[in-house]
């Protein structure tokens, strides 16, 4: 959507969310909450290595994004306007250093080659970056020398990782991850909470917009004894609720996320948030605990794009919280789940709804809905 004026992007997103929510009787009255600057908002870039035929018929290593409509061709980039400006020189230096090795890019068609992906995370508060280079196995000394040079040339790079992947799939996540220099994590802040990020930690793409969403959630959530934070990730929603609720329970399937969530609670002096590892639909089957000892006043859900598991919906209805806050990155899944929640017992009604432009220049949008029990 980069060829569409930002005001028009927001109108299109409002229309899309409105149409989906109207199917369950919800009106989106407020405009979509914009970003002050719809450019350079992303805190993470995942680039792909490829090969381009250069002048003189010499194959040149490229690093960038897949060409529109092509699975195989990678467009070489010097700069991405969705990423903070300090990331661009790091990309250029990494491309130069990788080319200097003479090693080829990985080819998905033949499953041959070496360089696969380049991941860069940027800290808004520290103005530093974490760099992770994903390759196939081998060339240990070459990679260590490469990162030694990178850390000398780019002082903004505060953390360096080497990921090794033998997967046939074209995904950035490696089977092995080795810390090669700098700090083990990237430090940043979301509202008043200090956080630490690893290469594959999940954080909303725009830290600025995430802060607005969490502030809005706290404003809507009131106070109470117990809150649930389902699909809690790094624990940020739970931390934001910790001042208003006596006890917060966070659930997530990713143990790495929960390890950082516990670290974040300790770093920020929060002692009333408890994190549990597992699938929400499985952990919540302990009805004696969740529906009696830990029965919530508030349940917050932030599920993946596919939405809520039917068992989670059933448990939410069985727990009868006074309020349910649903944060969604897929308004169609949101509407589907709301239909199930509205048709169950006890009866819930939507009392607040707001859409946030988390992803300018794309069609994606975040939607926050507050349900209250009749």
Task: Show the residue positions of the predicted features.
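Short edge beta-strands and adjacent turn/loop segments
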Residues: 112-125
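Solvent-exposed residues in well-ordered beta-strands and their adjoining turns
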Residues: 48-52, 68, 121, 134-136, ...
